[in-house]
């Protein structure tokens, strides 16, 4: 009995080894692909226009625009009339030239300004500008009121009065007390021009030195005032 069961068991194991496995079940069916909503099915990479055919109408329009620009015609805006160019006023005429028209050049009016001031009357024949004749020649010009009239008159008349006035003006300020004494004027009866000139030069030199000393004293006092705290 044991021997009869053993071969049957071995034959069953051989059948399991030689038996093929069952086939796998097929995969489930996949849903169809849906296109994107923003994609346009009519436009495809194969339907793109060629570069020669692209923008043929635009090239004609660009050429027409270039022609208009070369001609210089401005493009009028829709709803507006033609553009008016501003007109400039004509330039003023050039002033007349010539030797006898010197006064007329001053009378040219500039636009935007008032009339020129009253000009003096033209000189009479034989009269030079700045040198009047007749009664005006007899009267000397008025002396200036700035305090230097005496000095100029004194220099023209020999320098005696002008130099005395200058020295007196310095002493009135309180700084001319220690100045050098004025030199005695030369004797007019001698008639020596060289002595007169030498005396005047010495006097002018002394006055100049005194003026330099006064200026230096004023500057020293000024710097001292600046150096002292207020």
Swiss-Prot record:
Compartments where located: Host cytoplasm; Host nucleus
Ranges annotated as biased composition (Basic and acidic residues): 50-78, 128-140, 148-163
Post-translational modification summary for this protein: Phosphorylated by host ERK. The phosphorylation triggers a structural change that enhances keratin binding and protein stability.
GO biological process: symbiont-mediated arrest of host cell cycle during G2/M transition
Gene Ontology cellular component list: host cell cytoplasm; host cell nucleus
Note: The major E4 form is first synthesized as an E1^E4 fusion protein from spliced E1^E4 transcripts, such that the first few amino acids of the E4 protein are derived from the N terminus of E1.
Family: Belongs to the papillomaviridae E4 protein family.
Name recorded for this polypeptide: Protein E4
């Amino acid at each position: 009995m044991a021997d009869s069961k053993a071969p049957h068991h071995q034959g069953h194991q051989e059948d399991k080894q030689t038996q093929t496995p069952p086939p796998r079940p097929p995969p489930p069916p996949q849903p169809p692909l849906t296109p994107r909503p923003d994609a346009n099915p009519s436009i495809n990479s194969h339907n793109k226009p060629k570069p020669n055919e692209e923008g043929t109408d635009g090239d004609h329009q660009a050429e027409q625009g270039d022609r208009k620009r070369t001609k210089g015609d401005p493009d009028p805006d829709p709803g507006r009339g033609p553009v008016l160019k501003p007109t400039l006023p004509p330039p003023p005429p050039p002033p007349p030239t010539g030797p006898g028209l010197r006064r007329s050049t001053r009378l040219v009016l500039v636009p935007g300004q008032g009339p020129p001031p009253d000009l003096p009357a033209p000189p009479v024949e034989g009269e030079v500008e700045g040198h009047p004749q007749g009664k005006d020649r007899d009267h000397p010009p008025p002396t200036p009121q700035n305090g230097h009239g005496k000095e100029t008159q004194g220099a023209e008349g020999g320098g005696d009065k002008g130099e005395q006035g200058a020295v007196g003006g310095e002493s009135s300020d309180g700084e001319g007390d220690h100045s050098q004494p004025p030199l005695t004027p030369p004797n007019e009866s001698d008639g020596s021009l060289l002595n007169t000139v030498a005396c005047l030069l010495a006097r002018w030199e002394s006055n100049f030195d005194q003026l330099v000393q006064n200026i230096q004293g004023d500057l020293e006092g000024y710097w001292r005032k600046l150096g002292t705290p207020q």
